[in-house]
């Protein structure tokens, strides 16, 4: 028996391995099964070039559980005592590297270029044994044992067949790995597509009301996964079946892209466009990254462009190591090339579907939209390509490319400053009246109700020359597209004041909601009262919900305009009745108010151009008193108008109709509206 110390520079290597080699201890199973697959593939390579002339036989890798042990067994090339000394005792040398160098033209399928992979066993084990016999003629089987210290033993043993058994004596604090369900889940996660059969226990079948083991190995992996095959050999059903295996609970994918590139990097895989039902779906299933069919991670940020991390599927590249780190991904040139390549393949595929089957593309647009919009918002190169196939949808359900839509609206939706005005709604039902008003003017209205449409609107205003997006409920229809300078409202100021004060007094108090009341001449057939919201302020608040650094806007109240149509019969009747009821009480207040205004204006004019210290205190006090008196008289007037409005059911009814149209009438206010409506009928 040989005893010795492992060739490391410090005796603290094992605690370091145990704690820091990999972030997840479960990785040990991936590493050891991958090593077993390596050894098997090496034997296949040697047989293919006639350096091994024996019988290959069954090459299945077996994983088995004992009371306190996990054993990984292969029938690969095995190791001699000298090879154990070189590859096991001298940490950081890897047999796969030497093997690749010697057989680089024939050994493309070797996984194990990871150096420290074997030592991951010590993350979960108090003792590890290697029982191995080389394929070489006359080789002596040996057993290597190490308890996690730098000391090891190496002795000759009897072993009938070539290959290697790795026996792990599991630590007391890692007993979870002795559970069949835990190992089964890890094998499914990491080894589902390894290129050599992996067996874990025996297949089971129902017999006499219970599950019993059969004699057949329970092979857990598909050795020739779909992405390794040629697209010409595959049917649509093959791709759909593979998707169902990857994501059993998901709907059928929209379509897929089969990737296969050999230069300047190696990459294969299949990416699927899933149906995204809600925000909850966005991170539920992720793209799986493999290295020569060994599962690496589902955190593919950096390898896949951000907007495509929403896709599903698999990527496989030997150019990305198993112990991949975020800093590696950010700096590696191959990774950047892969990301660019994937983005190009996706845009080419989308362009191809749009060009060859536009009907299918339009049918799937609502599902594709989030991917395409996300890409256009985050990647300039993708925007340049996607603008040719990205679509607008109008409220009638018709689809247009950007260019087609510009052609459609340029004659009728260009304002006096030569800006092209894109009208849009984000809820067909809630904004129905505004949409209909716009359509009655001959305008087309887009439906922009997607999760990213707020950001898209802002971006498109920057990208599309002399273009502006305006939501249909942001103003009265005549003001949405101003084609000529308008005459000012003909209603005199005192009448506007009376109307505004009456209606403002009856507006409901709502949390973080403010109203500005105004009058406009909108024609006899226009709505008597409308509620609009400034495009700018609404958009800023919407952006605050999705973009960091804009919380200021999110905290501001919602600002709405209550627009009174001075041409409408009902508004005229309210005004006439208000003047009749209030004129006697208002007249003396108005006379006094005009006198105060005249004196205040004269005093302000006298003080114009003077510094504050040059204005006599008496004048300052007088102006302050006049300001207070003006406010007091104004409040008296408003109180009289409010008293009138409180008794006039038509005022509150018109307000409630406008609120109801905007889905802003709820609870007690809605109940009162219904009662009042019955009384008025």
From Swiss-Prot:
Q: How does it assemble?
A: Homodimer.
* Top-level taxon in the UniProt lineage: Bacteria
Q: Which gene encodes it?
A: htpG
| Family to which this protein belongs | Belongs to the heat shock protein 90 family.
**What NCBIfam families does UniProt report for this protein, alphabetically?**
PRK05218.1
Q: What is this protein called?
A: Chaperone protein htpG
Species per Swiss-Prot/TrEMBL record: Bacteroides fragilis (strain YCH46)
Q: Which Pfam families match?
A: HATPase_c_3, HSP90
Task: Give the UniProt keywords, A-Z.
Answer: ATP-binding, Chaperone, Cytoplasm, Nucleotide-binding, Stress response
Record carries keyword Isomerase: no
Main localization of the protein described in the UniProt heading: cytoplasm
Locations listed in the record: Cytoplasm
Q: Does the keyword Chaperone apply?
A: yes
Q: Give the start-end ranges of region A.
A: 1-326
Which Gene Ontology molecular function entries are recorded, alphabetically? ATP binding; ATP hydrolysis activity; ATP-dependent protein folding chaperone; unfolded protein binding
Q: Where is this region: B?
A: 327-545
GO cellular component terms, alphabetically, are: cytoplasm
Where does the record place the region C?
546-681
What this chain does, per the entry, is described as:
Molecular chaperone. Has ATPase activity.
């Amino acid at each position: 028996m040989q005893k010795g110390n492992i060739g490391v520079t410090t005796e603290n290597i094992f605690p370091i391995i145990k704690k820091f080699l990999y972030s997840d201890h479960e990785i040990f199973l991936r590493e050891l099964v991958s090593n077993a697959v390596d050894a098997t593939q090496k034997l296949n390579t040697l047989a293919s070039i006639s350096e091994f002339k024996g019988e290959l036989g069954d090459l299945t890798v077996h994983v088995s559980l004992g009371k306190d042990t996990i054993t990984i067994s292969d029938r690969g090339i095995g190791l001699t005592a000298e090879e154990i000394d070189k590859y096991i005792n001298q940490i950081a040398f890897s047999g796969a590297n030497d093997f690749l160098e010697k057989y680089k033209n024939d050994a493309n399928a070797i996984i194990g270029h990871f150096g420290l992979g074997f030592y991951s066993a010590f993350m979960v084990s108090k003792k590890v044994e290697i029982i191995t016999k080389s394929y070489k003629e006359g080789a002596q089987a040996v057993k290597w044992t190490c308890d996690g210290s730098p000391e090891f033993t190496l002795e000759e043993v009897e072993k009938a067949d070539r290959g290697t058994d790795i026996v792990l004596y599991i630590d007391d604090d890692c007993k979870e790995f002795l559970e069949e369900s835990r190992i089964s889940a890890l094998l499914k996660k990491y080894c589902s597509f390894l290129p050599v059969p992996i067996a874990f226990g025996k297949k089971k079948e129902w017999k006499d009301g219970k599950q019993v083991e059969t004699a057949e190995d329970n092979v857990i992996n598909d050795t020739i996964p779909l992405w390794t095959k040629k697209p010409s050999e595959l049917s649509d059903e093959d791709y759909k079946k593979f998707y169902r295996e990857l994501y059993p609970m998901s709907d059928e994918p929209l379509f897929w892209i089969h990737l296969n590139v050999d230069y300047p990097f190696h990459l294969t895989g299949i990416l699927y466009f899933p149906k995204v039902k809600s925000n909850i779906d966005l991170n539920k299933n992720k793209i799986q990254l493999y290295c020569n069919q060994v599962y690496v991670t589902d955190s593919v940020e950096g390898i896949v462009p951000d907007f495509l991390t929403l896709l599903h599927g698999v990527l496989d590249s030997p150019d990305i190591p198993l112990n991949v780190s975020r800093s590696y991904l950010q700096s590696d040139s191959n990774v950047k090339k892969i990301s660019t390549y994937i983005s190009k393949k996706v845009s080419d595929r989308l362009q191809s579907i749009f060009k060859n089957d536009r009907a299918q593309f339009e049918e799937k647009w609502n599902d594709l939209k989030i991917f395409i919009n996300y890409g256009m918002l985050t990647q300039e190169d993708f925007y340049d390509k996607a603008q040719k196939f990205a679509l607008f949808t109008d409220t009638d359900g018709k689809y247009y490319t950007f260019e087609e839509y510009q052609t459609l609206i340029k004659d009728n939706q260009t304002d006096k400053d030569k800006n092209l005005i894109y009208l849009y709604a984000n809820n067909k039902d809630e904004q129905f009246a505004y949409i209909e008003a716009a359509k009655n003017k001959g305008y087309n209205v887009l439906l922009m109700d997607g999760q990213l449409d707020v950001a898209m609107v802002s971006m498109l205003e920057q990208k599309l020359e002399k273009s502006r997006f305006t939501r249909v409920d942001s103003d009265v229809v005549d003001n949405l597209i101003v084609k000529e300078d308008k005459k000012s409202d003909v209603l005199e100021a005192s009448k506007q004041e009376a109307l505004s004060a009456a209606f403002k007094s009856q507006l409901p108090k709502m949390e973080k909601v403010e109203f500005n009341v105004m009058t406009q001449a909108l024609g006899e057939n226009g709505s008597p009262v409308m509620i609009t919201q400034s495009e700018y302020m609404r958009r800023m608040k919407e952006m605050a919900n999705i973009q960091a650094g804009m919380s200021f806007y999110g905290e501001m109240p919602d600002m709405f305009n209550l627009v009174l149509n001075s041409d409408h019969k009902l508004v005229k009747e309210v005004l006439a009745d208000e003047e009749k009821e209030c004129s006697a009480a208002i007249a003396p207040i108005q006379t006094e108010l005009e006198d105060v205004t005249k004196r205040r204006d004269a005093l302000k004019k006298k003080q114009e151009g003077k510094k504050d210290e040059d204005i006599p205190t008496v004048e300052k006090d007088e102006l302050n008193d006049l300001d207070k008196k003006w406010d007091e008289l104004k409040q008296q007037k408003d109180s009289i108008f409010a008293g009138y409005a409180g008794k006039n059911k038509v005022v509150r009814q018109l307000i409630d109709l406008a609120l109801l149209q905007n889905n802003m009438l709820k609870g007690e206010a809605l109940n009162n509206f219904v009662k009042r409506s019955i009384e008025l009928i």
